[in-house]
Amino acid sequence: MAPIYTAKTFEPAAINFGPVEKNKMGGKFIPIVDKNGTKTKVTLQFPAMNLPFGISAYRDRPENDPMSYSVDLSFRGYETNENTLLLFNKLTEFDNHLIDAAYANSVAWFGKQKSRELLEDTYRKLTKVDPSGKYAPMTKTKISLRNGKPNVQVFDTDKSNISVEDVPRGATVKVIAEIGSVWFIGSGTSWGVTFQALQLLVTEKPNKMTDFAFVSEDGEEDAPVSTEPMFDSE
């Protein structure tokens, strides 16, 4: 079993990249390799983070079937949370490390020498920052499919197995996800890496009012229930 890194033990600068390869569809990819050049995957455990939209289900194209799924995680409050701040910094460091590697290997990866600025513009970063600063940064992991269904283990707060549909919007979750290669669209008009979620643990659910919750306001008594009709019958 590959080691599972946390934000504290994850070292982006130690990640190496192999030579260009072709997938079954003819597209190219760059495998992640260890220090001996053997293909490997990097498995990372994300700290507890807010899941504002729940598990997102969508179609890449209207005619595509089945659905695709992703886990969109918010860095809300990361400025004062050591673990989420460290993850944000490590993912940013990994983005820069990958862009540096792409620039150094531009001819092999893209067929020609590209400027670092162009590589930055076409690279899909692991963190998405709101330009206005109104919303917290986000990061995303995708969920692979097996036989058309989400291929991920999901655990409730009591560690029992649940389905992706049971994860509520606004929950706090931990995710274990992995990356294994660098992907490219076309000749490199878009490129990057994608975390694939392996396991998801719900650590906290949003509060819901399940019991009677109305309270009397100051100086107000509980109003009597009227049995009279609201309007007189004509």
Predicted regions and their residues:
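OB-fold ssDNA-binding interfaces and closely related basic DNA-contact patches used
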Residues: 1-145
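Generic preference for flexible, low-structure residues
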Residues: 114, 157, 211-213
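Generic alpha-helix signal with a bias toward terminal, lower-confidence helices
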Residues: 58, 106, 185, 207-209
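Long, low-complexity intrinsically disordered regions
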Residues: 205-234
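Extended serine/threonine-enriched, polar tracts that run as long, contiguous segments within proteins
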Residues: 128-205
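N-terminal functional modules and adjacent low-complexity/disordered segments of proteins
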Residues: 5, 10-12, 39-41, 180, ...
